[in-house]
Amino acid sequence: MVNPLDSVNPSHALFEGFVQAQTCKETQQNFTELCRHLQVDPKDYKHFYSKLKDRLNYWKAKDLWQKIDKRAAHPDYDQGKACHQNKCLVLGAGPCGLRTAIELALLGAQVVVLEKRSSFTRNNVLHLWPFTIKDLLNLGAKKFYGRFCSGSIHHISIRQLQLILLKVALFLGVEVHTGVAFEGLNEPSGSAGWRANVSPKSHPVADFQFDVFISAGGGKYVPDGFKIKELRGKLAIGITANFVNRHTKQEAQVQEISGVARIYNQQFFQALQSEIGVDLENIVYYKDDTHYFVMTAKKASLLKKGVIKQDFSDADKLLAPSNVNQEALQDYAFEACDFSTEHLLPNLEFAKNHKGQADVAMFDFTCMQRAESASLVKERNGKRLLIGLVGDSLVEPFWPLGTGIARGFLGAFDAAWMVRSWGKGVQPMEVLAERESVYQLLSQTTPENTSKNYMAYSIDPSTRYPNINLSSIKPRQVKRLYEAEEQESKPNKLKKPDIKAKPRKDSMKRLEELLSWCQKNTVGYEHVKVKDLSESWRSGLALCALIHSFRPELVDMSALDEYNIIKNNKLAFDLMEKEFGITPIMRPGDMMTCGKIDQLSMVVYLTQIRNALTEKDTPAAQSNTLSLSRKRSAVAFLNTLKRNSLQRHKDRLASVKGPRQQNMKEKEEKKDVKEESLSSETSACEPCYFCKKHLYVVERESAEGKFFHRSCFNCFQCGSTLRQGGYSFHSDNGRFYCELHSLAEEEEGDEGHGGAQNHTENGSKEDKNGETTAASSPPAHLSIKRKGSYKISVDPDFDESTEFPAPDQDEPPDLEESHQPPKPSELSAENTNMENQQHNINPVPAPRGSRAPLPKPRTVHNVVHEPCNIPEEAEQIPEEPKPKPSLRKLQQSEEEKVDLLSQDSDSETRGSSSAASTSSSSKQHEEEGYWSGGTTWGKSHREQRNRPCIRRKSEPPLPLTGHSQHGKMRSKFSPWNLSSPRLQQRFSVHRVPAGQSQPDQYVSEDDNEDDEDEDEEDLQAEHYLDCEGADFEFSDSEKRNLKRMKTLERKAKMTEIQRFHKAQSIQRRLEEIEVTFKELEEKGVELERALRGETGTGDPEIIDQWIELVQEKNNLLSEESDLMVASRQLELEDKQSMLEMELRRYMEMDDSEKSPEQQKHEAEILQEMLDVVDMRDSLVAFLEEKRLKEVNDQFNSSLDAKRRSTTASQVHWE
């Protein structure tokens, strides 16, 4: 508290004390003294701000008044008269509650805020979207908190944000009462209106009457009348930890971690687990008033470390305070935080919470809640009350997505717009309808799909949400949200859903329609006669006929033998899986040996086939399954990519072993024959491959010819959940692995068993091009010129089956022979072509130029001044006989190697094959705010261009030894290096000689003056300069360069954060799908048992329910496939970043300093990096081709419909 006698002008000193106050109590006390000294009454809310501004004539306050005046002058507020007759009660003085109160005060309403706590103690740090930063700056945040957003990552602690908003709210005449608990609403009685039931009862606010109530008190304070929807995922345990920030230089130099996710950075978490026993899903580190860490921990790890005393299936019991060892929790958090910052933070000490205890907490966010509606109106005794929700009460955020404050502020603006309409006398039903129309968009909002004109943001939703329809929901649809008096007297009867199937005349109609469709599309084929849904399909010819009927180029019916049942079914199953993503329901041998074909299995399989083959004939506006099969076929392609990647690794290991590889190949072939013979003896009702328990059709999953429960599909090494498109299979031991443990197991097996595992994952896999490889002599190399102008010598039989020309490739590969990779569709037909053929294709055309380019991530690059050539001797392929080459010989100039590194490793192919997809499942989960292929990841084309660079000061190269690659390397395990390797280098200011100027080539096209204006005050920040204790005078050009450098770094960090949020969104949605799958399978098993007569209730009517459930499961599979494609793109992007970082370190070393071992390791890194680039290019080309197919199918479908309508309308004259 400031003593007025200490200053010449006491009001100035009081104002300074108020602005600089760092606690809620101090802020309120200084504000009270300031008002008393200036003789202004805060309760005179209509005139308080104008009187305060007139009486406080202080130059430091003028800038703040200008900002507030500019905001208040917006037409939406109608000069503070829009709601001048309304009285509003806001529950909760959190950021969202205070932000709502500010808007209501600007509208002219009398606003009272209730807060149960007496102090602001939450040190947790919030991520800020760009518009929230601009919004807070416009409210004067920089005046109240000088370090606001001065770093490269935009964030602020909850406590500081509350203080900023509290001070603005007090200036605008908002009454804020702390230490007052809200206990409910008191309905009107007599002449009294709506009031609040509070504790203590004697508090004056208990007499406050209001007609608007805004709940911003969190999920626990949702008023009666609102229905809550719960989104369940797998058990998710979060841990937050705050450490004391002493603001030393050593602490300032520690890099923040904007987000590391296991979904694309498994090596970091593997090191964390192996070294200290801490098993996490993700971790974030922000630096603010405290060192703030937040992470998601695995239950098994917490139990093992003694953090959780006893295991319970119920999350509340599991995380109850009595079941948590606080000391063990502190140790767990300390070890994780210390390891993730590489032990660079000195003297880590926990900050204290409001109870004086260590500020470390564990919480459950397994279930996310959101309100089904955002508002309602209650009418009692002729008096109406408008109730709205904001903040966590409205939508509980998933913390790794960083959406809490952004969507919270958007919801606050939307609520203020609703109150504005209420104050202007709009009919209640219309107010509710418009509010719900806006609410439908809130959970979908991202920084990408909201308006970029942040300066134009206001409470009007049209300034924030592009193409919004404020009348999408009609007043008649929100009648339930208006509670009148007469409704209360009626009993609230809820209709229970009738879960029993109702008898219908067409109970078997679905089966008959399916059979009729099969007969229609197989009629006329020789030796094919479909009479039922079981035995007619035994030979496999009927399945091949179905495929040929729609895709004749895939099957040569004349080459099929009616009696070769296994071959026919294998061909059909393979084509269905690779072309349409439909996994087989049984082995080819089962179709020949089983006594009776299982009808339910065939119904499931044929239903998927019909959906896949007929989806292109369905109009886009009516189809719910458009492109579902193509999404799933993309996952089949991912499996091919992963198999080829693993095969290349095996071949490189095998090339060292030499002659024994041929022996291993022969043994493998014998094993394949044995496995095929064994499979033919298996019945269709075989048990789960893993647990050996009974496997019902509805719960059957398959991979690599194995059938199993979905819940049993886990990595053999670590037990992590595996999914289609994200596993590796070792055929020698029949085990499935995640990618992280697949290569490790391969290398260990090769060392321990003499190369016993150097073969493909699937023993029956043939060479993609149908070529045989001579083992006697190595073939001549081919010279290929790749993008980035680097040349690669490659053996002609090198397995390039999954590589395609990139969509934007300007010139074809310079091949000495015309060896071109096949199309994705031709990959699927490999078993069809029994002869050796070469497939000639044209490059995939680039997408239309009308598609908006994505913002360029990671725009800050380093220029390597003296790149060195890799000696060819380091990469010579052994001359001993081998089936395939181990490494491609590299012939690169200095410029070519620099060009290779200048290619950005970030993914600009955020799309998937579903860019134009309108599947119902995608739409459903867009509403929940999770990742959707049609929005955030809609761009499926990678624009190739070199990135601009910033010169970095020269540094001595770090010593790299052969041993270091097996130990703990920063480039391998450091999360920030993996996420954004270029930005971790320290920058220095280079003096520009007189008369010269630096080109502005590194300025991204979306830079603007607004970004630079806010950077002016932060130029001297120690965070950005490499000047230790020096006093610098910057020239104008240097200031411009530093501001732009800072802007680039900040934007690159934002891109990094967005990538983390996308990874977490994918992970969260995958976990929710997993829970939904389990529920569907449980229902499906009950129905299937009833259909098979196991429960004695074999009602044929249940078949409809069962088929609907199977269709719902198929839709989830399609969504999961889309997510896996996006996950794979992130994974490859991150892997390239890691390899690029390691390669740069070698290139910065002089050739003379490199040992032979280092040269060899450099060559291996470069080879692996090229493999990753190939895989990314292949995936891009595949997805682009799929997208073009979808566009073409939709176009042809619309043309056909137009032709039919034109033909029907023609008049024929006799």
From Swiss-Prot:
CDD domains in alphabetical order: CH_MICAL_EHBP-like (cd22198), LIM_Mical (cd09439)
Catalytic activity as recorded in UniProt: L-methionyl-[F-actin] + NADPH + O2 + H(+) = L-methionyl-(R)-S-oxide-[F-actin] + NADP(+) + H2O; NADPH + O2 + H(+) = H2O2 + NADP(+)
Single GO molecular function: metal ion binding
Record organism: Danio rerio
Known EC number: 1.14.13.225, 1.6.3.1
Family of the protein in this entry: Belongs to the Mical family.
Cellular compartment(s): Cytoplasm; Cytoplasm, Cytoskeleton; Midbody; Endosome membrane
Positions with a binding annotation for Zn(2+) 1: 688, 691, 709, 712
Compositional bias (Polar residues): 828-841, 974-987
Low complexity bias: start-end ranges: 910-922
Name of the protein: [F-actin]-monooxygenase mical1
Compositionally biased tracts (Basic and acidic residues): 663-676
Annotated region described as Disordered, given as residue ranges: 484-505, 649-676, 747-1019, 1194-1214
GO CC annotations on file: cytoplasm; cytoskeleton; cytosol; endosome membrane; midbody
Coiled coil: 1061-1131
Span of domain bMERB: 1053-1199
Function of the molecule: Monooxygenase that promotes depolymerization of F-actin by mediating oxidation of specific methionine residues on actin to form methionine-sulfoxide, resulting in actin filament disassembly and prevent repolymerization. May be involved in endosomal tubule extension and neosynthesized protein export.
Gene3D superfamilies hit by this protein: Calponin-like domain (1.10.418.10), Cysteine Rich Protein (2.10.110.10), FAD/NAD(P)-binding domain (3.50.50.60)
Sorted UniProt keywords: Actin-binding, Coiled coil, Cytoplasm, Cytoskeleton, Endosome, FAD, Flavoprotein, LIM domain, Membrane, Metal-binding, Monooxygenase, NADP, Oxidoreductase, Zinc
Acidic residues bias spans: 796-815, 1003-1019
LIM zinc-binding domain residues: 686-748
Binding site for Zn(2+) 2: 715, 718, 738, 741
Annotated region (Monooxygenase domain), positions in chain: 1-488
Xref: InterPro entries: bMERB_dom, CH_dom, CH_dom_sf, F-actin_Monoox_Mical, FAD-bd, FAD/NAD-bd_sf, Znf_LIM
Residues that bind FAD: 96, 115-117, 122-124, 182, 292, 392
Gene name of the record: mical1
